[in-house]
């Protein structure tokens, strides 16, 4: 659902592009380390270390503007978040492939379900879900100011991806708010 006006979204995009501590992302595929085209930064309540795709990210303490937005999203979603992985795709040639956010550090000891709230800014992009066991696929066009919430069994049964598009020349930024359990990281 759209939670921000076009004007609010444009202001957030401009501010976050200029003020977040963007760094190239790294992943390990088949034992080889790659630097991706997209940029990322991870913020949180503490200086957590988050491991995914064979690499480690060190959380920075919350940027004040990001923290205020987190509090707003927590009220909308009805779920607490203690971290945010921010992703920057500078144009449509930058994407993220099929994956699930199912790391043990994202699941509480009491339940297996992961809750991720993802807020988009900038270019409208195609975001897809693909069922892990069935031939089922869902395509969404994510607009600036739009929030989607992945919860329940989403990460267990579905993979998701941001698709490439050579026609898109504008940036897309998305903020993925998560609850991170540092003691459960393996």
What would you call each of these model-derived segments?
Residues 1-186:
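Non-heme Fe(II) oxygenase metal-center motifs and adjacent flexible, charged/small-residue loops
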């Amino acid at each position: 659902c759209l939670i921000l006006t076009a004007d609010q979204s444009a202001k957030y995009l401009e501010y976050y592009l200029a003020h977040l501590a963007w760094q190239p992302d790294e992943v390990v595929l088949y034992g080889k380390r790659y630097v991706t085209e997209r940029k990322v930064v991870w913020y949180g309540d503490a200086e957590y270390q988050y491991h995914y795709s064979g690499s480690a990210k060190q959380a920075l303490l919350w940027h004040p503007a990001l923290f205020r937005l987190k509090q707003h999203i927590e009220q909308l979603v009805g779920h607490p978040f203690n971290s945010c992985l921010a992703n920057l795709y500078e144009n449509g040639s930058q994407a993220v492939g099929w994956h699930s956010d199912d790391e043990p550090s994202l699941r509480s000891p009491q339940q297996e379900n992961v809750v991720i709230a993802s807020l988009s800014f900038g270019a409208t992009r195609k975001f897809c879900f693909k069922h892990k066991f069935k031939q089922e696929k869902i395509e969404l066009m994510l607009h600036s100011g739009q929030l989607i919430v992945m919860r329940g069994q989403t990460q267990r049964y579905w993979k998701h991806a941001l698709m490439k598009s050579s026609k898109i020349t504008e940036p897309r930024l998305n903020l993925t708010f998560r609850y991170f359990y540092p003691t459960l990281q393996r």
